[in-house]
Amino acid sequence: MEGKTTMKGLAMLGIGRIGWIEKKIPECGPLDALVRPLALAPCTSDTHTVWAGAIGDRHDMILGHEAVGQIVKVGSLVKRLKVGDKVIVPAITPDWGEEESQRGYPMHSGGMLGGWKFSNFKDGVFSEVFHVNEADANLALLPRDIKPEDAVMLSDMVTTGFHGAELANIKLGDTVCVIGIGPVGLMSVAGANHLGAGRIFAVGSRKHCCDIALEYGATDIINYKNGDIVEQILKATDGKGVDKVVIAGGDVHTFAQAVKMIKPGSDIGNVNYLGEGDNIDIPRSEWGVGMGHKHIHGGLTPGGRVRMEKLASLISTGKLDTSKLITHRFEGLEKVEDALMLMKNKPADLIKPVVRIHYDDEDTLH
């Protein structure tokens, strides 16, 4: 980066259009850091943003929010980090002094979804260099025993999937249904398992995802191609339904299925990015005409350093293997476009693509 003033990145040019652009390298504030990518992963939400226009039109905004990187510059007030450090970059990078952060909702710092900065209202990570606010609070050092490509799954997939299990308030022995077993849903299965769920139903149809769901702790597979998933769940539970539901896929109509399959006094946790539709369906009768104590919780995953450190410890201790999520591997920043198009086109064997970027001075930068 020495002497350079511009960087290239893969950007959303407008709704339905992407391309490579050149931009000025961001300024590094006193609390901030500039980072170069070591591993990147495109997300389904990137495709919602570009091709569905889910958050409105964006022009020349660099995409991407899942990264592991290496610090190339730190601000004068940064204490914990230095140039050359390899770091896990959470998709959610809150401003920790905001009122929402002080109230316990840092993911909404500055306003609803305000902690989600990358590829929302700030250039993302699919570039030669990217900016991270409040580096000490938001960047976690990459443990030496974790590969960058495995750690990049922590940025969003693991934390979001586990948050679905947290939102569903899963307790020991609960019967749980996870709707949607893409990478986030697979991590919701793993999260439910870690929180002590008993029977775990995983709803999906692609064989590879179903096989991996079983490896992460699912006990039953519900294939929506075999009939109504509510009827299948009720039949499998002798008409009782489930204690908790995690929604990690589907659309605005999926909430109706969740409400129909849970018991009174139960919880639904949603971490699915609803890219389309103005309203969600909640069936009046099955919701107990509004009084069924069937609770719906939807939440953006928490961000920040400490959460990344705790999730990384699950990999370091052998309790979570994120490499099972990675089905396609690329080398070089320019390949992030191919990886993004894979997420858009969703071939049957896809779970998650990862792009690894190498540098000659990766182990000597300081």
From Swiss-Prot:
It is an enzyme of class 1 (oxidoreductase). Zn(2+) binds at C43, H65, E66, D156. GO terms for molecular function: isopropanol dehydrogenase (NADP+) activity; zinc ion binding. It is found in: Cytoplasm. Its EC number is 1.1.1.80. NADP(+) binds at I181, G182, P183, V184, G204, S205, R206, Y224, V271, N272, Y273, K346. Binds 1 zinc ion per subunit. Keywords: Cytoplasm, Metal-binding, NADP, Oxidoreductase, Zinc. It catalyses: propan-2-ol + NADP(+) = acetone + NADPH + H(+). GO terms for cellular component: cytoplasm. Its cofactor is Zn(2+). InterPro entries: ADH-like_C, ADH-like_N, ADH_Zn_CS, GroES-like_sf, NAD(P)-bd_dom_sf, PKS_ER. Homodimer. Belongs to the zinc-containing alcohol dehydrogenase family. PANTHER family: NADP-DEPENDENT ISOPROPANOL DEHYDROGENASE (PTHR42813:SF4), ZINC-TYPE ALCOHOL DEHYDROGENASE-LIKE (PTHR42813). Alcohol dehydrogenase with a preference for medium chain secondary alcohols, such as 2-butanol and isopropanol. Has very low activity with primary alcohols, such as ethanol. Under physiological conditions, the enzyme reduces aldehydes and 2-ketones to produce secondary alcohols. Is also active with acetaldehyde and propionaldehyde. This is NADP-dependent isopropanol dehydrogenase. It comes from Entamoeba histolytica (strain ATCC 30459 / HM-1:IMSS / ABRM).
